[in-house]
Amino acid sequence: RVLFRSDNYDLLPATIQLSGAEIELATQKQREYRLQKALMTVSDDYDFILIDNPPALGLLTVNAFTAADAILIPVQTEFYALEGLGQLLNTIELVRKQFNESLDIAGILLTMYDGRTNLAKQVSEEVRQYFGDKVYHTVVPRSVRLSEAPSYGQAIIDFDPKSIGAQVYTELAQEVLKQYGN
């Protein structure tokens, strides 16, 4: 159910009811295709449908990957993020082989970047070396305003339109639109 409508987007936030979805899905036939089937009923109403997944690689994420045309992968510029990225890539390959052979990686988005730290610079360089052109030019910095916006139930563009976070996500949107020819 859409809980927030604006001129440019609709928002369906996760609710507490989603917490039991993994358990419910586990016993259902064709469980990997449930989200795909649900989205088919509304896909013509939207130019893009973005699904923000939890960092876990369970049935909810597999459902999202099965339903998706492409994945935008956010990568925190921190050490353990590289480890998690390897696991994510393995899951993507499994989903491609078993459920969605056309699943594409749209790009890698570097997030929580703090240019004052050597680690952020090193992680950024490693990701760019490995993924090359798949890494978006836009980099999301660490930002207090970005971390505050969700607690007010708002996107950063609505919460603080002049903030660096809003500017960066606007740049990312433009980069993605250019990538997909819109």
Report each predicted region and the residues it spans.
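P-loop/Walker-type NTP enzyme "switch/lid" segment
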Residues: 1-44, 99, 149-152
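Conserved beta-strand scaffold positions in the cores of enzyme catalytic domains, especially
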Residues: 11, 135-139, 156
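Active-site donor-binding loop signature of nucleotide-sugar glycosyltransferases
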Residues: 14, 138, 142, 161
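Charged catalytic carboxylate motif
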Residues: 34, 87, 168
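Conserved catalytic-core segment of NTP-binding enzymes
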Residues: 40-144
